[in-house]
C-alpha cells in the first residue's frame, strides 16, 4: 500500500451510514465478544433505520443473555426499543423448527419446500445445506430494514458463508445432466420412498431449489447489501483466525472491510503498580501493530476491556457508543 494512505475511520460509522446494507454478519473466534459487538451494532442501527433484526445463528444463543431477555425463534421486540427485534434459530434444525406463521402468504413456497425436504433426510449434507438456504431465504423475505447476524465461531460461520456457492455449483451440474440421468433419478426417487414423484417433478424441485440458492448467493456477494464484520482480540490465535476468516470471505466474494479489536487494556496511571496489566498491555500492543500492518485498508475499531460485564439493554446502549467514536479512557464512565 502507498505510504501516504490515509487511515480509515476507526469505527463502524461507515456501516451505520450505509443505507443500502441489508445483511451484516458479525463473526470471529469463540470468546472474543461477538455477541456484545453484534448487539451493540444493532442498537446503533436502530437509531437510523426503520426496523432492525438481530438474529443468532449460534447454537449457544447468547443474545438472550446479552439483553437479559429471553428470545425465541419468533422475532421479539427488545425491551427498551421500539424498532429493534431479536430472534434465535439453529440453521442446522432447518425449517421444521420454525413456527408456522413464517410460512403465510408469499412464503407458502417455503412451506412446501420444507415438507418436501422431509423426504430427503437420508441424503447426507443436503439437509444442512438446504436448512441454511431456507433460513436465509426466509430472512430475505422479512420486512426489516437491516438484519444483523450474530454468528457461531469461525469454522461454523465459514460453512454458512460458503454453502450458497457449493450448493449452487452442485445443483447446476446436476440439472445440466438431468436428461442423461433421468433413469437414475427415477431409481433415486424410489429409494427415497417418493413413489408419486417422477424424474421431471424432482427436476423441477431441484430447479426451484437452485433459484433460491442463487438469490441468496447474489445477495451474499453484493457489497451494497451484505458485509461482514470480524471481531478479534489482540492475541495470536485470535489474529490467526481473523486472517483465515478474511481470506475465506474474500475467496467467496463477500465484502469485509471492518475489524473490531475487543477487550483492549488502556493503561492509566492507576495501573502503574499492576505488573500483569503492563505485561498484557505490551502483548496487545505487539498484535495491534500487526493488525495495523495487515489491515491498513480496513476500518479497525478498538474496544476496551471493562471492569463490569456488558449486559442488559442500557448497558449495551452505553457500550455501543464505542463503535461510533474511538474509546477515550479518560472520559468519565457512564453508569
UniProtKB/Swiss-Prot annotation:
Which residues are recorded as binding Zn(2+)?
274, 277
Mention any one GO cellular component term assigned to this protein in its UniProt record: GET complex
Is Nucleotide-binding among this UniProt entry's keywords?
Answer: yes
| Keyword Transport in record | yes
Q: Where is the active site?
A: 58
Which EC numbers characterise this protein's activity in its record? Answer: 3.6.-.-
Concerning CDD domains, the annotation shows: ArsA
Q: Name one GO biological process term.
A: tail-anchored membrane protein insertion into ER membrane
Report the sequence similarity comment from the record: Belongs to the arsA ATPase family.
Descriptive protein name: ATPase ASNA1 homolog
Query: Which species does the entry assign this protein to?
Result: Drosophila sechellia (Fruit fly)
